[in-house]
């Protein structure tokens, strides 16, 4: 990550090309890229921008999904919305833009790995959206969001994540409940067991999965509900 207090002219032009907007107030871009740990930077850090950007992103994605999936239920739209505004998706956008080359952080943050570093990348994307909103208005922010999210929104697999996570979000949105997993049977020898797990969602029919581990069986059961309810397209139909 860069250690310079502000972007060089070359870096600014490169990043603005990736964003699709030339900032009127150049310091807004610097602000959006500055983590709180980079305390020497006078423009402030991106924490307040992140708060605003999260709301702008949610609005634009909700509108995109509403217009794109005309027959989807509120619960189905909520699941897709949660996928598309997740830290994982925002971090993927950051990686696509190579934002790690421009983010300013303190020495401690530079050492972060895994989920914590993923969150930093995701936060910067949200702060960048806020900076665009402040610099050019909602249409400028929406143009950027569509540039990087529209393709993700219409992927056949709905930008699949963990099946249990997806099912929980759908169950909360549609029924206001949490899925319940039950181990019905464990069979086979210790070196090659088989777990039979049923998942129940109040308001929907249960499904069962059989796998070599309890977690894998839970995933299979969750996937079957998601595919049955049309939240996920069956894998066989995607080929």
From Swiss-Prot:
Mg(2+) binds at residues 50, 123, 126. The active site is at residues 54, 126. Residues 12-137 form the RNase III domain. It catalyses: Endonucleolytic cleavage to 5'-phosphomonoester. Its EC number is 3.1.26.3. Keywords: Cytoplasm, Endonuclease, Hydrolase, Magnesium, Metal-binding, mRNA processing, Nuclease, RNA-binding, rRNA processing, rRNA-binding, tRNA processing. It comes from the Bacteria. The keyword Cytoplasm applies. InterPro entries: dsRBD_dom, RNase_III, RNase_III_dom, RNase_III_sf. Residues 162-231 form the DRBM domain. Its cofactor is Mg(2+). The keyword Nucleotide-binding does not apply. It is found in: Cytoplasm. GO terms for molecular function: double-stranded RNA binding; metal ion binding; ribonuclease III activity; rRNA binding. Its main location: cytoplasm. One of its GO terms (biological process) is tRNA processing. GO terms for cellular component: cytoplasm. NCBIfam families: RNaseIII. HAMAP family: RNase_III. Belongs to the ribonuclease III family. Digests double-stranded RNA. Involved in the processing of primary rRNA transcript to yield the immediate precursors to the large and small rRNAs (23S and 16S). Processes some mRNAs, and tRNAs when they are encoded in the rRNA operon. Processes pre-crRNA and tracrRNA of type II CRISPR loci if present in the organism. Homodimer. This is Ribonuclease 3. It comes from Rhizobium rhizogenes (strain K84 / ATCC BAA-868).
């Amino acid at each position: 990550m860069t250690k310079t207090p502000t972007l060089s002219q070359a870096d600014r032009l490169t990043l603005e090309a990736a964003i699709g907007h030339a900032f009127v107030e150049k310091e807004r871009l610097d602000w959006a890229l500055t983590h709180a740990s980079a305390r020497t930077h006078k423009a402030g850090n991106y924490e307040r921008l992140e708060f605003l950007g999260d709301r702008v992103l949610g609005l634009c994605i909700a509108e995109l999904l509403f217009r794109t999936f005309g027959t989807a239920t509120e619960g189905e739209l909520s699941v897709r919305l949660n996928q598309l505004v997740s830290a994982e998706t925002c971090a993927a956008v950051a990686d696509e833009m190579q934002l790690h080359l421009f983010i300013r952080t303190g020495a401690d943050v530079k050492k972060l790995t895994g989920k914590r570093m993923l969150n930093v990348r995701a936060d910067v994307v949200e702060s960048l959206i806020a900076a665009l909103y402040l610099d050019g208005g909602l249409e400028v922010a929406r143009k950027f969001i569509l540039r990087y999210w529209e393709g993700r929104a219409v992927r056949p697999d709905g930008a699949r994540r963990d099946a249990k996570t997806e099912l929980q979000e759908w169950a909360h949105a549609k029924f206001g409940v949490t899925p319940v997993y039950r181990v019905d049977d464990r069979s086979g020898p210790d070196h090659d067991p088989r777990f039979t797990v049923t998942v129940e969602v109040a308001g929907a029919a249960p499904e069962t999965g059989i796998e070599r581990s309890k977690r894998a069986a839970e995933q299979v059961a969750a996937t079957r509900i998601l595919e049955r309810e049309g939240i996920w397209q069956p894998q066989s139909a995607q080929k």
